[in-house]
């Protein structure tokens, strides 16, 4: 799952930073992916086991793929919002302090914000489709579309946050505030991807981590 998301992030990043002047963004995207792959091979590693009966459905690859793609695009959007906030703090030509050498090669705040917004535009419908497909699968498997399972709940909260980000981003003078909402959405996404699986018991706790 994590490896698939890493691959999707790599593809999205490659499309976004293919221009020569965007290559300085690569380290900001590669570093978290290296950490994710390390955790995948250590903390989250487990022996392969037969798929539980509830997951033996053609809905599995459809639901997981759509949610994973939406989450991956959203995470890249969040990284660009982080870089945007750094650029707002240290505009082009006014870099200062110990972070100046790191921020100086980055594109302008306007360009970074534009990419974060465009990626979130894709995140919202893809993630929404994944949630809807999961609800359809839940009705077929357990006889109800929604059960407020922890993962379902936080997926819905994440989707609402991305909708709030897009709404705030469309409001004049709210670019910085919108970027912070995008970071909250990214944090909620990461919390849902890792903490929920590791600690909280629920219908999505099939990985054996909790």
Question: For the regions a protein language model found, what residue spans apply to each?
Answer:
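Polytopic transmembrane helical bundles with strong interfacial aromatic enrichment
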Residues: 1-210
């Amino acid at each position: 799952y994590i490896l698939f998301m890493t691959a999707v992030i790599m593809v999205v990043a490659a499309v976004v930073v293919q221009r020569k002047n965007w290559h300085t963004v690569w380290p900001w995207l590669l570093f978290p992916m290296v950490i994710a792959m390390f955790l995948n091979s250590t903390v989250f590693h487990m022996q392969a086991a037969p798929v539980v009966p509830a997951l033996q459905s053609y809905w599995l690859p459809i639901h997981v793929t759509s949610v994973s793609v939406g989450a991956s695009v959203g995470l890249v959007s969040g990284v660009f919002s982080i870089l945007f906030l750094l650029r707002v703090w240290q505009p082009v030509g006014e870099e200062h302090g110990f972070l100046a050498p790191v921020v100086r090669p980055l594109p302008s705040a306007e360009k970074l914000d534009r990419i974060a917004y465009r990626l979130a535009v894709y995140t919202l419908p893809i993630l929404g489709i994944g949630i809807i497909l999961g609800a359809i699968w839940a009705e077929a498997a357990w006889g109800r579309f929604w059960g407020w399972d922890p993962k379902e709940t936080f997926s819905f909260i994440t989707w609402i946050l991305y909708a709030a980000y897009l709404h705030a981003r469309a409001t004049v003078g709210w670019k910085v505030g919108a970027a912070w909402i995008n970071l909250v959405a990214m944090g909620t996404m990461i919390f849902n991807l890792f903490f929920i699986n590791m600690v909280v018991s629920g219908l999505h706790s099939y990985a054996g981590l909790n």
